Amino acid sequence: MAKLTKRQKAIAEKIEAGKSYNFVDAAALLTELSTVKFSESIDVAVNLGVDPRKSDQVVRSATVLPHGTGKTVRVAVFTQGPAAEAALAAGADRVGMDDLAAEMKAGDLNYDVVIASPDAMRVVGQLGQVLGPRGLMPNPKVGTVTPDVANAVKNAKAGQVRYRTDKNGIIHTSVGKVGFDAVKLKENVEALIADLKRIKPASSKGIYVKRITLSTTMGPGLVIDQGSLEA
């Protein structure tokens, strides 16, 4: 059996196996256990009572977190005319059409979110092999193909997170950073859970939100007592 590192021992001593933590207590403990030299993200994993093998039970959406994620988000927008001006005014980092597509084909992909107006999809459609593997392909299901590109830019800049169930029916997303106020983190997670409940597939039976786990980038996962959340 491999020996535990000093950090792993310290973590093991602080965590109670099998315990469900009050959210605020969990956030405080994760912050205490974060000893790495960079600002770790705080992530949530939500196990949903869905069968992801069934297309009508794949949960995919986006949520604007009330307090953002603490990350700087770079946004590119495919649109033209007045919508282009509106996107720039809303804070887009780059707006274009064929010129932007050419840049991306050449390898300029330093963006976290790519948004497109419906009339721009003729250009974006050529970028499937470039944007798809990076999870950047605009999609109407998560609000990144929309006539209102300015609002989509504002949402992205405000800390909108996008997610979909993995093969095990679990949603993974960042909800903040170590050092965030615990109450703000809690409100971010509550907003996410409320959205997940709102889009619950009609064919999903039994318990829907089965388990919520909070973790840091390099740290342990703590199971959250759902009774400590207002969602």
Curated annotation (Swiss-Prot):
GO CC terms, sorted: cytosolic large ribosomal subunit
Alphabetical list of Gene3D superfamilies matching this protein: 3.30.190.20, 3.40.50.790
Keyword Ribonucleoprotein: yes
GO molecular function: rRNA binding; structural constituent of ribosome; tRNA binding
Pfam families associated with the record: Ribosomal_L1
Top-rank taxon, per record: Bacteria
Transmembrane segment boundaries: none
Keyword check for Ribonucleoprotein: yes
Keyword annotations from UniProtKB, A to Z: Repressor, Ribonucleoprotein, Ribosomal protein, RNA-binding, rRNA-binding, Translation regulation, tRNA-binding
SUPFAM superfamilies from the UniProt entry: Ribosomal protein L1
GO biological process, one term: translation
Role, per record: Binds directly to 23S rRNA. The L1 stalk is quite mobile in the ribosome, and is involved in E site tRNA release. Protein L1 is also a translational repressor protein, it controls the translation of the L11 operon by binding to its mRNA.
Family of the protein in this entry: Belongs to the universal ribosomal protein uL1 family.
Assembly, per entry: Part of the 50S ribosomal subunit.
PANTHER family: 54S RIBOSOMAL PROTEIN L1, MITOCHONDRIAL, LARGE RIBOSOMAL SUBUNIT PROTEIN UL1M
NCBIfam families: rplA_bact
Name listed for the protein in its UniProt record: Large ribosomal subunit protein uL1
The organism of origin for this protein: Pseudomonas syringae pv. syringae (strain B728a)
Gene coding for it: rplA
